[in-house]
A protein has these predicted regions:
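Glycine/proline-enriched, intrinsically flexible loops and inter-domain linkers
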Residues: 1-681
Length: 681
C-alpha cells in the first residue's frame, strides 16, 4: 500500500478549477510512479478557505470570493477524480479568515501494488522513455510560482504557470502503466511533476546520469525552445527507464492502449546530464553538483510561547440547546453533503465505510476501502486539522492534528499499532525568524508524537510562502499570511471490514459512554469562534496516554463490544452526540454531570458549556449494547471513562446539566441546523 498527499495552493488561488484538477492528477501520478507502478484505489481532498460570508468589499484586489473559490476547487477534484474512475472518499473542509487570500488545496491518493513491485532500479544503458501527454508551454515555472508570495497581480503575471489537465488522457496512461508493469517492461518510473522532464530525468539519473535529445520529445505545437521543453510541467506524462530489449514490447503495449511513448535518451552511467537540441549541446551538468552542489541554508528561528490565559465569558451564555444549534451550523462543523455528493464513492466497488452514514446520513470519522475487491482486509483513511490553534501553540496544533487523524481511523476499527502517517506543512514566510520558529515547533511535535504513538511518517510535503501582498485603497502596503497549518493524514489497516464501526446510533436501549478525560481546553474552539468565550487553555496532547486509550478502544471494538463510535473534536461532546443521532435517525440522552472531567475554574452554567463544547483531544463517544456493558470496565481498565446516557426512541437530544437542569432539542432541528449551510456558489 502506498499513499501520498500533495498541495496545489497557489495555482488554485488564481484558477480554482484547473489548480485543484491538476493537483489531483499530479498526486495520482505520484502513486502511479511509486515502485513499478501502484494502482490508484482511493482519493482524498482537504480544502482550507476563507470565511464564506466575507463581504465582497472586504476582499483585497485579485482575490476570488471564498464561496466561488470553494465551488471551483470542488468541481476540479470532482471532474478529474470521477473521470479517472477513482473514488474520492475522504476529506475535510476548514474555514478561517487567514485563508482568504491563500486557500489550501490538499489532494491525496492511495495505491496498491504487488509486494515484488515495490522496488525499482535504473541501470546504465536503459532508455529514457516519456509516455502520455505531449509537451507544451502550459505550467512553465509552476514550481517557481508555487514557492513565492501571491499578490494582486499574480493572476495576470503567472496565469500561464497553472497546468492544464486532461483526466481521460491520464486514465489511459494509468491503464498502460499498469499493464506494462504487469509484463515487467520497465525498470523504474517517475512522473513529470514540478520541473517537468528536468526533475523527472534528473531524479532518475541522479547517480548514473543521462543523455536526452530534446528534439525527440513529442510537442503539442511548434515553437518551443529547449528550455521550455526541458522544464514544461505539461500534465499526464511519465518517464520510464526501459531496457533496450524491452522497448519494442513496451511500444506495442502503448500503441494497444492508445498512449504515445517515445524514447528520448539513455541513462549513461557517466554521472552527467547532457541535453541535445537541434544538433548541438544545449546543456551539460554534473549530477553530483546538480543534486548536492547548492550550499545548505542556515536560517534564524525564534519561538516565544504565548502565555496561557483564563477563559473570559464574553456574553451571557445561551442555553445549551441554542448553542449546540449554532455550533452545528458553523462552517467548520456543518454538513459538507453538497460537496460529498458530487464525488463518486462507489467506482471500483471497494468502498465499505463512506463519508455519509446511517438512515439520516450523518458524518463519518474515517472511511474504509477494501484493498482488493472480494477480500475483507481494508484500509482506513482519516485526516486531522487543528488550524484554529496554530497561532496559539504550533506544537499542540501539529500534535492535535496527528492525534485527531489517528483517533478517526481507530474509531472505525483500524489497528492502532499498524498506522502510517503523512504530514503536509503549510506556512507563511519562513524567512522571518518568528514564522520559522513556529515551523520548527510543529516539526518537533511530529517527531515526538510519532515516536510516542509508534506510528511512522511515510510521506509528506511542505508549501511555504503562503502570503498575499497588496496595496489598499489608501495606498498602504498590506499583507495577509495563513495561520500555521499542518494537515495530518492517517492510514490504518482493518483486518476484517465486516467488523468496522460507524458513528451513527443503532438501537434504542443501548448505553452511551464517554472515553477520555474532559478538560477546559477552550482556546481555538468552536465555542470561542461563536464569541461565547475568549482565551483559556489550548487543547493539550499526552501522546503516551492517547496510545493506551487507542489500544483499549481498539480491543473493545475488536471484541464486538462497541456498536457505534465517534471521536470528539470540532464542537465538542454535544456536537459529536448530535451527529451520531442525526446519522442514526434516533434520539439520545446525555448527562453532563457524569462526564469524566477535570475543570479549572468553570462553575455553574459555564461548567455545563465547558463540558458540552470543550475540544479536549483523544476522547470518544461509544454506543454499547446492554449485554456488553459489563465488560467495559475490563476493556477500558486504567483509562478515564463513564456511562453518560443512552439511545432512545424519541427523536430528540435530551441534556441534563451538571446541576440537574434539563433541556431537549428535537432531532429535526439538529439536522436542519447541521444542513443549513450549502456553500455551493
Amino acid at each position: 500500500i502506498c499513499i501520498k498527499v500533495e498541495t496545489h495552493n497557489h495555482p488554485s488561488a488564481i484558477e480554482p478549477y484547473g489548480g485543484a484538477a491538476t493537483g489531483l492528477g499530479g498526486v495520482i501520478r505520484d502513486v502511479l510512479g511509486t515502485g513499478l507502478g501502484a494502482k490508484p484505489i482511493a482519493n482524498l481532498d482537504v480544502f482550507c478557505v476563507g470565511n464564506p460570508d466575507t463581504p465582497a468589499a472586504d476582499l483585497p484586489p485579485g482575490v476570488i470570493p471564498p464561496q466561488r473559490l470553494l465551488a471551483g476547487v470542488v468541481a476540479g477534484v470532482r471532474d478529474y477524480g470521477n473521470r479517472m474512475g477513482i473514488p474520492t472518499i475522504a476529506g475535510a473542509v476548514a474555514f478561517h479568515p487567514g485563508y482568504l487570500c491563500n486557500p489550501l488545496v490538499f489532494c491525496g491518493t492511495v495505491g496498491i501494488m504487488p509486494r515484488n513491485s515495490a522496488n525499482a532500479e535504473v541501470k546504465a544503458g536503459d532508455l529514457v522513455v516519456v509516455a502520455g501527454g505531449r509537451t507544451g508551454r502550459d505550467g512553465i515555472h509552476g514550481a517557481t510560482f508555487s514557492s513565492i508570495e501571491l499578490t494582486s497581480d499574480s493572476e495576470a503575471q503567472s496565469g500561464g504557470s497553472v497546468q492544464i489537465g486532461h483526466a481521460i488522457n491520464e486514465k489511459v496512461l494509468v491503464e498502460f502503466i499498469l499493464e506494462a508493469s504487469r509484463q515487467r517492461l520497465f525498470r523504474a518510473i517517475t512522473d513529470c511533476g514540478a520541473g517537468g522532464l528536468s526533475s523527472a530525468v534528473g531524479e532518475m539519473g541522479a547517480i548514473l546520469g543521462a543523455t536526452v535529445d530534446l528534439d525527440r520529445v513529442p510537442l503539442k505545437y511548434e515553437g518551443l525552445s529547449a528550455t521550455e521543453v526541458w522544464i514544461s510541467e505539461a500534465q499526464e506524462r511519465m518517464v520510464l527507464a526501459v531496457a533496450p530489449g524491452d522497448w519494442e514490447k513496451l511500444a506495442r503495449v502503448a500503441a494497444d492502449e492508445g498512449v504515445e511513448a517515445t524514447a528520448i535518451g539513455t541513462f549513461t552511467g557517466d554521472g552527467r546530464i547532457d541535453l541535445k537540441w537541434q544538433g548541438r549541446v544545449a546543456g551539460s551538468l554534473d549530477c553530483h553538483f546538480l543534486h548536492e552542489g547548492r550550499p545548505r541554508q542556515r536560517l534564524p528561528s525564534r519561538y516565544v510561547p504565548l502565555p496561557a490565559t483564563a477563559p473570559v465569558w464574553s456574553r451571557e451564555a445561551a442555553s445549551l440547546g441554542a448553542t449546540l444549534l449554532d455550533i452545528l451550523a458553523a462552517p467548520d462543523v456543518a454538513s459538507k453533503e453538497w460537496i460529498i455528493r458530487q464525488y463518486d464513492h462507489e467506482v471500483q466497488g471497494c468502498s465499505v465505510v463512506k463519508p455519509l452514514l446511517g438512515p439520516g446520513e450523518g458524518p463519518a470519522d474515517a472511511t474504509v476501502v477494501r484493498g482488493v475487491l472480494g477480500r475483507d482486509r481494508g484500509i482506513a483513511l482519516g485526516v486531522g486539522l487543528r488550524h484554529r490553534i496554530g497561532p496559539l501553540d504550533p506544537w499542540q496544533m501539529a500534535a492535535g492534528g496527528i492525534v485527531e487523524a489517528v483517533a478517526n481511523v481507530v474509531a472505525t476499527g483500524a489497528d492502532p499499532d499498524r498506522i502510517a502517517l503523512l504530514d503536509n506543512f503549510c506556512w507563511g514566510d519562513t524567512r522571518r525568524p518568528e514564522s520559522l520558529g513556529t515551523l520548527v515547533e510543529a516539526c518537533r511535535a511530529c517527531h515526538d508524537v510519532a515516536v510516542d504513538l509508534g506510528s511512522p511518517f511515510v510521506s509528506g510535503k511542505d508549501s511555504l510562502n503562503n502570503v498575499f501582498a497588496w496595496t489598499d485603497a489608501a495606498g498602504k502596503p498590506r499583507e495577509l499570511s495563513i495561520p500555521p497549518t499542518l494537515l495530518a493524514t492517517a492510514m490504518g489497516q482493518v483486518d476484517d471490514v465486516r467488523r468496522v464501526v460507524t458513528p451513527d446510533l443503532k438501537r434504542p436501549g443501548n448505553r452511551l459512554a464517554v472515553i477520555g478525560l474532559t478538560r477546559d481546553d477552550l482556546a481555538g474552539s468552536q465555542l470561542e469562534a461563536l464569541g461565547v468565550v475568549t482565551g483559556g487553555q489550548v487543547p493539550r496532547i499526552d501522546a503516551p496516554s492517547c496510545r493506551e486509550t487507542f489500544r483499549r478502544l481498539a480491543r473493545a471494538i475488536r471484541d464486538g463490544g462497541i456498536i457505534a463510535c465517534h471521536d470528539i473534536s470540532d464542537g465538542g461532546l454535544l456536537a459529536a452526540v448530535a451527529e451520531m443521532a442525526i446519522g442514526g435517525g434516533i434520539g439520545a440522552t446525555i448527562d453532563l454531570g457524569k462526564v469524566p472531567a477535570l475543570l479549572g475554574g468553570a462553575q455553574g452554567r459555564h461548567a455545563d458549556l465547558t463540558i458540552a463544547f470543550t475540544e479536549t483531544p483523544c476522547r470518544f463517544v461509544c454506543e454499547v449494547a446492554p449485554e456488553s456493558a459489563t465488560r467495559m470496565g475490563e476493556w477500558l481498565d486504567g483509562i478515564p471513562w463513564a456511562w453518560v446516557g443512552e439511545v432512545v426512541t424519541a427523536p430528540e437530544l435530551s441534556i441534563t446539566g451538571c446541576f440537574g437542569a434539563e433541556e431537549s432539542v428535537k432531532l429535526d432541528r439538529l439536522a436542519r441546523a447541521w444542513r443549513s449551510r450549502k456553500t455551493s456558489s
